[in-house]
Every structure is written in structure tokens, then in C-alpha cells.
């Protein structure tokens, strides 16, 4: 039941999304716990489970910075010998094929070939947009979906187990990688087709499944929500934190850059593009900032103000 008395939280709730519901459905249920300002970073398909970053309060403002350059780790299972319209187990079967010519060595080589940079085809049933419309809506309406690709990076791919026609694997990949597409391409390479049957997101930069809370627990124990939320100032663990004086806080709120003090950043010599979280005198997040030159003077410029409640 919704608890309107719960205070709005400001931070990241690392959720262990269960298999079945959409990411949006999970968010809607948590919203009923008095969390009117809520969002998420990195959608998971309904058939997938694992790390879903739920952004609460002021943390909804940092989604782009939280995800920037962040790696994801997935483990999953694919099945050889069939194809579906969605490239996973949830879709309508389009074809079946004999897979018995495929050996374990063939599978291991094919998984190894995922590693590196490539242009990946985006599934027709996806949230990627064409002229403002999600591709999945066009596909469901029977309309032609344009072939879209995106640049991805797989830093590591490994075969965990082979029990043909099933293959378990793990990949370390860039944000935006479609694991369904990897399964589909592997099936094409082996000449028998393949679909994704299971997917677990084990890591979404900078949080892992070990830090995640089950949705049922979050909903059953609303009074524990605050203790489960990672505060905003800790949501960007690799960003330096700088506490400002009251006078400097006022200047930042008025849109003025904050002077760069080399003594505050002794371990990191000045270069343009260093990012930090500016804190107010009480230690609460005030703004995200980045180093730059203004009139040849090194300063911190505000990327995103966090002081509005």
C-alpha cells in the first residue's frame, strides 16, 4: 500500500529487478511509496533480471553523468536452433533449424568473436526511436522498421557452460549494448539461429548485484527505504567532493564559476574536464561541476545544479 508519509528520498536505489515486469512497472510500484520524483537509468527488458538503477529525487538530474562511459556486465543463456521476431524467448517463433552440426569449440570461438568494437544491429522490438516513434510500436503495428545500428564495445566475452543447444555466457560491454543482438548474430554465424532465453545484469556502473535489493523486500518494508538508498553524494564515487563556504555557495547558485584551488586537488593536477561534486557548507550536494578556463583562469563551471528541491 502507498505510504504518502514517506519522505522523498534523494539518491540511488540499486534494485534487483525480477523477471517478468517491465522496468516502468517496477518504477511505478516504488513511486507509490511517496516517491513522486523518480526515474531509472538503463532499461531492462521484461524477461531480464538484475541491476536496475532507480533514481530518486535530485538524483534524477544526474542520470546522464551516472551512465556516462559506464560498463555493464551481463550473464545469460541462449538457445541454438530457432529464431523469433524479438530475438529472445518472449517472441513469436519465426524459424527452427538443425543445430547438431555445431560443436562446443564452434560456440566458444563464436562467443570470443563478440570481443572488440563493432556496429551492432538494433532489434526491431526495442525502445530505440525512428522519427520519434519507438521501434517496438512500429513492429507491433506491422509497419516496416528501419535497420538501425549503433557502435558498441565488448571488453570481455566468455563462455561459461555449453550444454547444446543451450549456451551460458558472460559479457562486459558498453552502455547501450543489446544482448539479444549478440545472441542473434551468434546464431547467424553458426548457421542455425539462436535466441536469448535468460539474462541477468550483474553490474551497471558503478553498482553491482551484490548491492541490489529485491523489489518484493522494498515494497514490503517501506520504512526501510531510506536505509536502502545510496545518497546522492555517494552515487558518483569516483568524482572528487569539494565543500564550499556559504559565500561560494551563493555565488554558484547565481551562476558564477567557482575558483579552482590547487591545494584542494593536490593529487590531481589541473586539466580541463575534471569533474567533481560541489557540496554546500552542510555537506549536501550543491552541483556537478567541471574544470575549465575562463579568461585564462582555471575555474569550476557548473554542469548541473542540484539545489532545487
Curated annotation (Swiss-Prot):
Look up keyword Isomerase and say if it applies: yes
Q: Name the residues annotated as catalytic in the UniProt entry.
A: 45 (nucleophile)
- Biological process (GO), any one: tRNA pseudouridine synthesis
Belongs to which family?
A: Belongs to the pseudouridine synthase TruB family. Type 1 subfamily.
Give the EC number(s) under which this enzyme is classified: 5.4.99.25
Q: What does this protein do?
A: Responsible for synthesis of pseudouridine from uracil-55 in the psi GC loop of transfer RNAs.
Taxonomic path = Bacteria, Pseudomonadati, Thermodesulfobacteriota, Desulfovibrionia, Desulfovibrionales
The reaction(s) this protein catalyses: uridine(55) in tRNA = pseudouridine(55) in tRNA
Q: What InterPro entries does the annotation carry? A: PsdUridine_synth_cat_dom_sf, PsdUridine_synth_N, tRNA_psdUridine_synth_TruB, TruB_C
Which UniProt keywords are given for this protein, alphabetically ordered? Isomerase, tRNA processing
UniProt name for this protein? tRNA pseudouridine synthase B
One GO molecular function term?
Answer: RNA binding
Please name the source species. Oleidesulfovibrio alaskensis (strain ATCC BAA-1058 / DSM 17464 / G20) (Desulfovibrio alaskensis)
